[in-house]
From Swiss-Prot:
This is Bifunctional glutamine synthetase adenylyltransferase/adenylyl-removing enzyme. It comes from the Bacteria. One of its GO terms (biological process) is regulation of glutamine family amino acid metabolic process. SUPFAM superfamilies: Nucleotidyltransferase, Nucleotidyltransferase substrate binding subunit/domain. GO terms for cellular component: cytosol. Involved in the regulation of glutamine synthetase GlnA, a key enzyme in the process to assimilate ammonia. When cellular nitrogen levels are high, the C-terminal adenylyl transferase (AT) inactivates GlnA by covalent transfer of an adenylyl group from ATP to specific tyrosine residue of GlnA, thus reducing its activity. Conversely, when nitrogen levels are low, the N-terminal adenylyl removase (AR) activates GlnA by removing the adenylyl group by phosphorolysis, increasing its activity.
Length: 948
């Protein structure tokens, strides 16, 4: 007998009086009145429904004059709903009708349940059958109208195709709670177009609109409430996936994209109201995904992760005393059963069931669980399910939370016939302790380390709405959680659309929460995560790299460090993922060769590649350059290398690559045409001059190469091969082949951009110049700016004799006496022209190279001093780099010590900033404190070049 506390009864007095006014014409026995008042006291929901629908509820609430609640047969729900819907003409009326039926039937079911007139299994059957009927009859009502409006969706045999509704979770298992949401997936049999008199629709569009209308009928909150909360997050790709999916697409998804937690979800999946052919097709589709042919102990690890997600989420929300999600709750019983189902279900057909009860019996028969333990588990499970129903029947709320307020506790005690709260709490605690102990036997105990390892797993799984996700991110101290969440969502959506196989998906699932933790702990989480994701996106289909990062903390640490320090590095890693191999050994990453050893390192990269395999050699050179450049950048960022050494290493690397490229070009050309007389691989009769930054040993990250090709070969005669060509043509083809090797874009990118415009006569000149012609041009025809460029030129490839010849030509040309006034005017005019075209006008940013007081001014000053005084001081021709030339000028008293140091200091600072900008992927300096350095440069400029 339901006997609520007197305090509860008095609190419902007003509601009872209001109810009697509405139903004054209805005669109740004293016992019936007492029962109704008690129900109102423990369930405000029943009271509200009785007051709102008196003519539909109370007139036949009791079975005659007795105390039993009159329930309709569960199998008649469908007919009753169909009959009611046949009397409405639009969706608004349909919504009102469905909500009235739902509230009245649920109120009576709640009453019968509370009064213990139905068993738990009977009530579960009622709730689930009503849900099936509401879905099926609503869909039938809508489908008929959609066909009239848009035509018939027909299959290849001209048969009308229904929309297929897949029930998940407790609905799928026919174990629905009193106030539960329903988890659905929508599908349709075949692609095509509707057939009808009006405008045809693609089947996907037709079923999508139909699904939206069905959700509206059931889920929309109107003045009359809801029928069911509809949750679509279990569909393929979750919230980002299509609302309705074809069966073929569904099959492809679970074969290629299905995740571990979806296997658990699919254990209970069933089609609701579908013909047998579709149900069979669905089960054949899903069975290989859910039940593996082998014993699958990996299911345990997947379950532990899912349980950890639930634990993290309940802790985040501050949830306590939750009889479903807490330790020892309903979900753990389900997990115990489902873990065994997924491990052995592929071999044991008796475990392929949606029912907890049937599956538990199967486990006992297979000796997988002790019979007494199974009996106690089911008893405890049923006890918690009864409490779950009572909690929800209080106010028709989907809750599994034990009440903390006095009224809620009194209501629950009354509904469960418990005299006091402490007794009930103790029974619940004992029940959940037994369940949790059994759960730990199956999946192992949890630890804080497990949670640390999983990191932010809950953010990566598609189980959170936006508000919950943002709350988690914000709780981690992130200033702009929305930006971070958008990055995560977009990347997650893209990753699920790209096939990487089960192994790849598993590795990505392990990696992503860890990387999220790295990003969130950083000062600029959004910036770091964006760079990390660009790299992970690039290797998503390369499982080995995902596993490398997931399993190698050192590699992850270096990746985060380098990506945060430099977007240029992250871009290089994204473009060339093979560089991730360099992160495995941090000690090796920061260990650089000596400048003189780069040639030997390159040879190691190429030594195992057959000479005739030019394509592989080209890729290997590119990969070597990228790997070595990454090591230089890593050493730069960590402070291992100083500025001058960075450029030294980058320049030495470029020289070694030039030597290898010329060698490769020579070998492939001579194999075809033979070689000129008196030449060989070690003495090609060919030299490469480096100009600009390479010539000045001031190369930066991403710098191109300014090159000039010269030869001392005799152009008379032909090569000595089977297909001989003229010697001049040979060297032209050699230059073309060198350019090809440098600039062709392979899968590994390009080697270097090469600029040959500084050769004699520029773009109009020959690609290769004979040394005599080279000397004559520089001596007789070169413009002042070409002589300035020559100051920074030096041989970077060639035998010593040819290098010496070229340097002698350079020295001879630079040492010519020049008209001081004419030289000064020419240099000033050229610089003014550059400023006019290259300076960023009206910009607060500083162009380190071109703006007044920048690098170009220092270079022009240096070049002026060489061209002005080298005829008198040949020492000025020894070097091609600015710092040593300025130092030499000071020692020759061509500059004061102050001016020389100011120029050198400014140049080194600007170069350092230039390296930093390159690593940041920028070209202009935004905020700087370099006004003093710029002014010192301008003072020198004015003193040397402007003052008369």
């Amino acid at each position: 007998m339901l006997t609520p506390d007197n305090k509860l009864m008095s609190e419902t007095e007003t509601a009872w009086e209001r109810y009697k006014e509405v139903v004054e014409s209805i005669t109740l026995t004293a016992e019936q009145e007492q029962i109704l008042r008690a129900l109102f006291a423990v369930s405000p929901f029943i009271g509200r429904v009785a007051e709102s629908y008196p003519e539909h509820l109370v007139t036949d609430f009791f079975d005659g004059s007795g105390s039993s609640v009159r329930l309709i047969d569960a199998d008649s729900y469908g007919d009753r709903i169909a009959e009611s819907l046949s009397q409405v003409t639009n969706e608004d009326e349909a919504k009102k009708c469905l909500r009235r039926l739902r509230h009245c039937w649920m109120a009576k079911l709640a009453a019968a349940d509370i009064l213990q007139q139905v068993s738990l299994k009977e009530s579960l059957h009622h709730y689930s059958t009503f849900a099936d009927a509401a879905i099926n009859k609503s869909l039938e009502w809508l489908f008929e109208r959609f066909v009239q409006r848009h035509g018939k969706p027909l299959d290849a045999n001209d048969q009308l195709m229904p929309m297929l509704v897949i029930g998940m979770g407790k609905l799928g298992g026919k174990e629905l709670n009193f106030s539960s949401d329903i988890d659905l997936i929508f599908a349709f049999p075949e692609q095509g177009e509707t057939q009808g008199p009006g405008r045809n629709l693609e089947h996907g569009v037709f079923y999508k609109r139909l699904a939206q209308s069905l959700i509206g009928l059931l889920d929309e909150t109107t003045a009359d409430g809801q029928v069911f909360r509809v949750d679509m997050r279990l569909r393929p790709f979750g919230q980002s996936g299509p609302l309705v999916t074809s069966l073929n697409a569904l099959e492809h998804y679970y074969q290629e994209q299905g995740r571990d937690w979806e296997r658990y979800a699919m254990v209970k999946a069933r089609m609701i109201g579908a013909d047998e052919q579709y149900e069979q097709a669905f089960q054949q589709l899903i069975r290989p995904f859910v039940y593996r042919r082998y014993i699958d102990f990996g299911a345990i690890e997947a379950l532990r992760k899912m349980k950890l997600l639930i634990t993290q989420e309940t802790r985040r929300q501050g949830v306590k005393n939750n009889i479903k999600l807490g330790a020892g709750g309903i979900r753990e019983v389900e997990f115990i059963v489902q873990a065994h189902q997924l491990i052995r279900g592929g071999q044991e057909k008796s475990l392929q069931t949606r029912s907890v009860y049937i599956a538990m019996n199967g486990l006992v028969e297979l000796d997988l669980i002790d019979p007494e333990h199974a009996r106690q588990l089911l008893k405890d499970y049923e006890y918690l399910r009864v409490i779950e129903h009572r909690l929800q029947q209080i106010d028709d709320q989907q809750t599994q939370q034990l009440p903390t307020d006095e009224t809620g506790r009194m209501r629950l005690c009354a509904m469960l016939n418990e005299p006091e709260w402490e007794t009930l709490q103790r029974k619940i605690d004992e029940c959940m302790e037994r369940i949790h102990a059994e759960f730990q036997q199956v999946v192992g105990a949890e630890s804080e380390d497990d949670e640390d390892e999983q990191g932010l797993q809950v953010l990566w799984q598609d189980m959170l709405d936006d508000d919950a996700a943002l709350e988690i991110i914000e709780s981690e101290g992130v200033d702009e959680p929305q930006a971070l969440w958008t990055l995560i969502k977009n990347f997650r959506q893209e990753s699920r659309r790209r096939s990487s196989g089960p192994r790849g998906r598993s590795a990505l699932a392990r990696l992503m929460p860890i990387m999220l933790r790295h990003a969130i702990q950083h000062q600029h989480p959004e910036r770091l995560l964006e760079r990390l994701l660009s790299i992970i996106k690039a290797v998503m289909s390369r499982t080995a790299y995902i596993e490398l990062l997931a399993e190698n903390p050192g590699a992850r640490e270096q990746l985060c460090k380098l990506c945060m320090a430099s977007p240029w590095i992250s871009e290089q890693l994204a473009l060339h993922p093979i560089l991730l191999d360099e992160l495995i050994d941090p000690q090796q990453l920061y260990s650089l060769p000596e400048s003189k050893d780069y040639a030997a390192v390159l040879r190691e990269y190429l030594m195992r590649i057959p000479e005739q395999d030019l394509e592989t050699q080209m890729d290997a050179l590119r990969q070597a350059k990228q790997a070595l450049q990454l090591k230089i950048a890593a050493a730069d960022i960590s402070g291992v290398l100083e500025l001058m050494n960075v450029s030294d290493h980058l320049s030495a690397l470029a020289e070694a690559i030039i030597s290898e490229v010329v060698g490769l070009a020579w070998q492939h050309l001579t194999q075809k045409h033979g070689k000129p007389a008196g030449t060989c691989l070690d003495n090609t009769g060919f030299a490469v001059l480096g100009y600009g930054k390479l010539g000045g040993q001031e190369l930066g990250y991403g710098s191109d190469l300014d090159l000039v090709f010269v030869t001392d070969a005799n152009y008379q005669g032909q090569t000595d091969g089977q297909r001989p060509i003229e010697v001049q043509q040979f060297y032209l083809r050699l230059a073309q082949r060198i350019l090809h090797l440098f600039t062709t874009r392979t899968v590994a990118g390009i080697l270097y951009d090469v600029d040959l415009r500084l050769r004699p006569s520029g773009q109009a000149g020959l690609l290769v110049t004979q040394v005599n012609s080279f000397a004559r041009y520089l001596r007789d025809d070169a413009w002042t700016w070409e002589l300035q460029a020559l100051v920074r030129a030096r041989p970077v490839y060639g035998v010593p004799a040819l290098r010496d010849t070229v340097m002698d030509i350079r020295r001879s040309v630079l040492s010519q006496k020049r008209d001081e006034q004419e030289l000064r005017q020419s240099i000033v005019k050229m610089r003014e022209k550059m400023r006019e075209h290259l300076t960023q006008r009206n910009s607060r940013k500083f162009d380190l190279k071109q703006d007044p007081g920048g690098i170009a001014d220092i270079e022009f000053i240096t070049q002026y001093l060489v061209l002005r005084y080298a005829h008198k001081y040949p020492e000025l021709c020894k070097y091609s780099d600015n710092v040593r030339l300025l130092t030499e000028a000071q020692q020759l008293h061509l500059l004061t010590e102050v001016d020389a140091q100011n120029l050198i200091n400014a140049f080194q600072i600007f170069r350092c900033e230039s390296h930093s900008l390159a690593l940041q992927g920028e070209q202009l300096l935004e905020e700087h404190n370099l006004d003093n350095e710029r002014q010192a440069v301008l003072n020198c400029w004015n003193h040397l070049l402007e003052d008369d």
